[in-house]
Amino acid sequence: MVDNARAARMAKRIQTIVASAIEREIKDRRLEYITITDVTMTGDLHDATVFYTVRGENVGDEPDLEAAAEALHRARGQLRKIVGEQLGVRFTPTLTYRVDTVPEASAHMEALLERARQRDAELAKLKENAVPAGDPNPYKSDTREEDEA
């Protein structure tokens, strides 16, 4: 039987443990710029997927995704041991690491929304000077014409 609430609690706890272990216990310079963004658990609580993002050393620098992935791969045993010790469950879940693509997707979505806003502003400018083709209100009827007919 799947207990989604327990899986969610365990995922949140694993996220906290892994993030603090990377920050405080694992001494690898390639892990300095990693942020753990989310953890998902399977229903049987045997597998956890850890999502992470990597930022560059400086604001304008490109992140080194391969080095970060290699560092996480090399530290996976130590991280699993730390998670097992701090989690206190019978079976320590297997940890799989995946790059989180949500920031890139949201940046792309923001760019699309900005483009739509610019087009709306252009249309609003065109609409200000627009004149209807024909009568200003084609549905308005002149009552005098109807009375004479």
UniProtKB/Swiss-Prot annotation:
Question: Which keywords, in A-to-Z order, does the entry hold?
Answer: Cytoplasm, Ribosome biogenesis
Report the record's Gene Ontology biological process terms.
Answer: maturation of SSU-rRNA
Where is this protein primarily located? Answer: cytoplasm
The cellular component terms of Gene Ontology attached to this UniProt record, alphabetical and capped at eight, are: cytosol
Name a Pfam family for this protein. RBFA
Q: Where is this region: Disordered?
A: 125-149
Q: Where in the cell is it found?
A: Cytoplasm
Q: Name one GO molecular function term.
A: ribosomal small subunit binding
Gene3D superfamilies, per this entry? Answer: 3.30.300.20
- UniProt function note: One of several proteins that assist in the late maturation steps of the functional core of the 30S ribosomal subunit. Associates with free 30S ribosomal subunits (but not with 30S subunits that are part of 70S ribosomes or polysomes). Required for efficient processing of 16S rRNA. May interact with the 5'-terminal helix region of 16S rRNA.
Similarity field: Belongs to the RbfA family.
User: HAMAP family in the record, alphabetically?
Assistant: RbfA (MF_00003)
- Known partners and oligomeric status: Monomer. Binds 30S ribosomal subunits, but not 50S ribosomal subunits or 70S ribosomes.
PANTHER family found in the cross-reference section? RIBOSOME-BINDING FACTOR A, CHLOROPLASTIC-RELATED
Listed name of the protein:
Ribosome-binding factor A
